[in-house]
Amino acid sequence: MGISLFWAVAFLSKLKFNGLVYGLDFGLFHPDGQLYSFRALTMVGNSETAAGSIVSEWYRSHAFKLNVIDPQSLHYDTHPLWALYKSRMLYPILSAPFVLLFGMNGMLIIPALSMLVLMFSIQAIGIRLENKYLAFALAVLISMSPVITRWMFANITDGLLTALTSLFVVSYMYIKNTNLQLFTLGAIIILGSYTRISVVQWLAICVGLYLMNQKRNSILLGIVALVFFIPSALRNLRTGILPNEQESGLLNRPAQLGLSMAKVAFYEVGQLVVLDRLLILMIFFAGAVSIYSLHKESSKYFLLVLLALWVTGAINGTIGVNFRYQLPLIPFMAYSILESTKINIEVRSRIKN
């Protein structure tokens, strides 16, 4: 009940207060959400012409950046990004019934539910670790984070991927039958592959599984992640990896990756210092306890996924997107904090006794 209340307050607050902050788009309808909205509208029976007009008119009055859109530019045979977005079908499919009922506002339902899944998942992690009160506090703090709510409630796929990642962590912790766990985690990876490019994240988790002596599941899940990534990679080999460096050629791009990673680290940390100091403190705390307790499962997963999402942001090539591509780190951050604080509480209790 408490989680739902704080989620509702966060969602209603976001509906009421959204716009530009320091020139950054904290609105609900983002530029790449145009394509997801267009696809959902065509799925419910609108022609491309009608869908383009609906999106164009809506963005003109409800978006804050790049809100002047030529309706024909959104058509499947016109927009240059459809090759990249073609495989990102899960969000439009799930949103289609809500778009049918509520129009363009229906595109906000899945992101809102994704936020609820994230918050309940953190509570579930805390219950499993017998640290439910701190888990509740973390979920509440996350619902108040301006950066997290910026992306989780917007009409983009990052919130959905974060929700799936949260379910992955919960399933990993609660399902002990290895075959059932393999099936469940594999299904989540497949669904995640249809949100946006997430293969680096999944492979990092598979490395963690391997280190936890779950070698069979690690290898099989890694194969699943690669198999469902390959079709997207083949369609977007030039534009999917450091798209801003297309002129340098594919062979030269690895050399650019290090520079891109340095830029991502500088801008992401700088933006969080300005916009969300509490979030960056939680991340640094999780990093510190993970390094200190490196033998723990949660520590390994947090550090591996942190590196993977850092690389993902660098590969994308868009600098200064304010933690957007690192959003799936949140459930692992909670996992690390909750496990480490539980251990410290137990140690202090034994000392007193």
Locations of regions flagged by a protein language model:
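Short acidic/glycine- and proline-prone juxtamembrane loop motifs at membrane-interface regions
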Residues: 150-160, 322-323
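Start-transfer (signal-anchor) and selected internal transmembrane alpha helices
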Residues: 1-19, 24-26, 216, 220, ...
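Specific aromatic-rich, kink-prone transmembrane helix
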Residues: 121, 160-177, 184-188, 332-336
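Interfacial juxtamembrane loops and adjacent helix segments
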Residues: 42-87
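Membrane-lumen/periplasm interface segments of specific transmembrane helices
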Residues: 215-288
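Transmembrane-helix motifs of polytopic, lipid-linked glycan transferases
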Residues: 109-130
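Hydrophobic, aromatic-rich transmembrane alpha-helices
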Residues: 276-303, 309-311
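Membrane-interface alpha helices of multi-pass inner-membrane proteins
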Residues: 181-197, 203-208
